[in-house]
Amino acid sequence: MELIFLGTSAGVPTRSRNVTAILLHLQHPTQPGVWLFDCGEGTQHQMLNTAFHPGKLERIFISHLHGDHLFGLPGLLCSRSMAGNPHPLTVYGPQGVREFIATTLRLSGSWTDFPLQIEEVSAGDILDDGLRKVTAFRLEHPLECYGYRVVEHDKPGALNARALKAAGVTPGPLFQALKAGKTVTLADGRQINGADYLAPAVAGKSVAIFGDTAPCEAALALAQGVDVMVHETTLDASMEEKANSRGHSSTRQTATLAREAAVGRLIMTHISSRYDDKGCQRLLAECRAIFPATELAYDFSVFPV
């Protein structure tokens, strides 16, 4: 998996940062895909600067209904429809996202020509496509808001072909069954258990993508042990009280969460427009002082998971 940041500003766009949107590129060898997390104003325009377009999207996850996370959605849906893309799309989000989509399309005389499914979520598992699971966590914000934890299923370990050949098993259909951990019977009557010839399973990658939030109990469960945590750092440590009063987090709080959750890496985003490049570097330094494995996202930054 890899993350492509389309917008990294909080509240309003700036000359260098658009409002929130993040692509998750699912780099599976046989079932690749592209998911979008939040869709602030101008998201479809930002996508023009990437290798992806709205037609490639399979799923969109909306954290909450504030405009800087949502107002780009109607235009993106309409453009996807105008392009003649027939592939289905599912939108996940809090209560009200269905009404928002229906109302904006109706009042603007617009529609979608592709199958559009809308799922209003609550805390808990919301998706398992056989390759990965998505769990929603309710966060602390003035509007109903969720963060999403995406965890790949573990991959089977490599098959020890050399040992199987030494045991008299020839490559072919039997190898496929053994790779699946099944027991096969050879022509001479011997039974071979595939599990005995498999290396340990390879742990799937995991990422936690937060919506806007002040510190809360659910945040630790959402982030616990993930390879990558994407979290807002709206304001610096000196403005912590103001951040919390508006349902946001400071640099200090975000970095402390990353440390307590033992994540592999923290990626900062949702930066207040009050900070210029120098100010952003100060935010980064505040986080790294607590959690060194921190990166600052810019628009079009790409990070592997």
From Swiss-Prot:
Keywords: Endonuclease, Exonuclease, Hydrolase, Metal-binding, Nuclease, tRNA processing, Zinc
One term of GO molecular function: 3'-tRNA processing endoribonuclease activity
Chain residues that bind Zn(2+) 2: 68-69, 212, 270
Enzyme's top EC category: hydrolase
Binding-site residues for Zn(2+) 1, renumbered to this chain: 64, 66, 141, 212
The record's free-text note on cofactor binding: Binds 2 Zn(2+) ions.
One Pfam family from the record: Lactamase_B_2
Disulfide bond residue pairs: none
Gene3D superfamilies associated with the record: Ribonuclease Z/Hydroxyacylglutathione hydrolase-like
Active-site residues from the entry: 68 (proton acceptor)
Cofactor: Zn(2+)
E.C. number(s) listed in UniProt: 3.1.-.-
PANTHER family: ZINC PHOSPHODIESTERASE ELAC PROTEIN 1 (PTHR46018:SF2)
Subunit-level organization: Homodimer.
Family matches, as NCBIfam families: PRK00055.1-1, PRK00055.1-3, RNase_Z, true_RNase_BN
UniProt family annotation: Belongs to the RNase Z family. RNase BN subfamily.
Role played: Zinc phosphodiesterase, which has both exoribonuclease and endoribonuclease activities.
Protein name per UniProt: Ribonuclease BN
Species assigned in the record: Salmonella gallinarum (strain 287/91 / NCTC 13346)
